[in-house]
Design a protein with these regions (language model features):
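Conserved class I S-adenosyl-L-methionine
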Residues: 2-48, 145-161
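A short SAM/SAH-binding and catalytic strip from SAM-dependent methyltransferases
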Residues: 111-126
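A short glycine-rich, Lys/Arg-flanked "PGG" loop and its adjoining helix->strand segment in the class I
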Residues: 128-140
Length: 161
């Protein structure tokens, strides 16, 4: 089990990795096709359009842009200050700088949460608590989408993250 200090250091290294590689990350993901994820998830949300959407780990805003283009009301949360600035400037929607381990989310606010390749950054010892917090920010019948990178069922990090 990681101590609070170790969790803080892990978060610092993870965010530092994205800060250092922000330009390459943006270039490498801007055209990444996740349309099958969008469609499967959006089709499962029942309320009337527009949906209030939380993009959990929005990065520079690729998915926020897509959701906004469909007429939805997206809000992003992101750990990287660089990505928060890029998303706010280029997308023009609410984007909050937030540590994924210390969330501050309103209750019953969102019709859906889109967590595309982000939950793997949360250490195993914290994931249940974070999932409860995400559940509590969903409206009744809200839907959480999450995807993760392929791996060998090992908790660990690549490079400095």
């Amino acid at each position: 089990m990681l101590s609070p200090r170790e969790l803080q250091e892990l978060t610092r290294r993870t965010i530092g990795h994205y800060e250092f590689n922000s330009e390459n990350y943006q270039i490498g993901t801007v055209d990444h096709d996740v349309s099958q994820n969008y469609m499967a998830w959006l089709d499962s949300i029942e309320p009337e359009i527009p949906f209030k959407i939380l993009d959990f780990g929005c990065g520079p805003g690729r998915d926020l842009r897509y959701f906004k283009s469909l007429g939805h009301i997206p809000t992003g949360i992101e750990g990287s200050e660089t990505f928060v600035k890029v998303a706010r400037t280029s997308i023009g929607c609410d984007v909050h700088h937030m540590n994924f381990i210390n969330l501050d989310l309103p209750q019953f606010e969102y019709d859906g949460i889109f967590a595309n390749a982000t939950l793997f950054h949360i250490p195993r010892q914290e994931i249940n608590r974070v999932m409860i917090e995400l559940h509590e920010t969903l409206k009744e019948r809200g839907v959480l989408f999450c995807s993760n990178q392929r791996g060998n069922n090992q908790e660990g990090f690549s490079g400095e993250r």
